[in-house]
Amino acid sequence: MHPARPALWAAALTALTLLRGPPVARAGAGAVGAGPVVRCEPCDARALSQCAPPPTAPACTELVREPGCGCCLTCALREGDACGVYTERCGTGLRCQPRPAEQYPLRALLNGRGFCANASAAGSLSTYLPSQPAPGNISESEEEHNAGSVESQVVPSTHRVTDSKFHPLHAKMDVIKKGHARDSQRYKVDYESQSTDTQNFSSESKRETEYGPCRREMEDTLNHLKFLNVLSPRGVHIPNCDKKGFYKKKQCRPSKGRKRGFCWCVDKYGQPLPGYDTKGKDDVHCLSVQSQ
């Protein structure tokens, strides 16, 4: 993950908190709030000892905590002052919000282009986001696009009846045709997705049958080695596989210093051959052993 992304996510969550309302209590206080919560470290005596003396009146009329997870006290912003995610907090009863004509409200708060306004009169986040059109104000293109969303609908909407009151039969046929077209398109998409899933499943099954058990064990071992901090060759066994992914007759443990690892004989599925104990022997010949 890029090192700057956590800071950007924290800033975005802070901007959403400014738009939604005053921040909830600190995580250590046991308060539970809705939405995302940024957990801050508790303000202990060590953290408070590093704070500078707070400003005093008349330069500062109200003291508030620093923005973010800060523990020190600073002057609160007054109504109408510029504010943002990285600036000081607004005073009691005020909320930092973007300008009414701001095109990008979150970006404005990140860049400090908001202003402190009365919390009771400030709008919520939905005020600055695109709102859904009312049912009676749907445009003609949107209505045509959504005409077939309800399969059982054969009668057009109220405002469409008013527009086509002289041709009710044509209006009904128009809606029915659009519904059939939408259903056929939906069936086509579902069929293509099912076909793609079937192809993926068949390819995975084919790959599973092409690779034998030895090849799968070797891949699992190599994947496991990626997550090990300390690699010990003595504790790692990589199987000896043939070209088709099955076990070769002779399998050996890794050497330990000057001592060679012992070998043994197995069948193509990796099962030790019965009646052939080779543990502790340095040289083993499995060519004459018949696999079962």
From Swiss-Prot:
Its main location: secreted. The keyword Lyase does not apply. Glycans are attached at residues 118, 137, 200. Residues 211-286 form the Thyroglobulin type-1 domain. GO terms for molecular function: fibronectin binding; insulin-like growth factor binding; insulin-like growth factor I binding; protein tyrosine phosphatase activator activity. Disulfide bonds join 40-69, 43-71, 51-72, 60-75, 83-96, 90-116, 214-241, 252-263, 265-286. Residues 192-203 have a biased composition (Polar residues). Keywords: Apoptosis, Disulfide bond, Glycoprotein, Growth factor binding, Phosphoprotein, Secreted, Signal. Pfam families: IGFBP (PF00219), Thyroglobulin_1 (PF00086). Interacts with XLKD1. Binds IGF2 more than IGF1. Forms a ternary complex of about 140 to 150 kDa with IGF1 or IGF2 and a 85 kDa glycoprotein (ALS). Interacts with TMEM219. IGF-binding proteins prolong the half-life of the IGFs and have been shown to either inhibit or stimulate the growth promoting effects of the IGFs on cell culture. They alter the interaction of IGFs with their cell surface receptors. Also exhibits IGF-independent antiproliferative and apoptotic effects mediated by its receptor TMEM219/IGFBP-3R. Promotes testicular germ cell apoptosis. PANTHER family: INSULIN-LIKE GROWTH FACTOR BINDING PROTEIN, INSULIN-LIKE GROWTH FACTOR-BINDING PROTEIN 3. This is Insulin-like growth factor-binding protein 3.
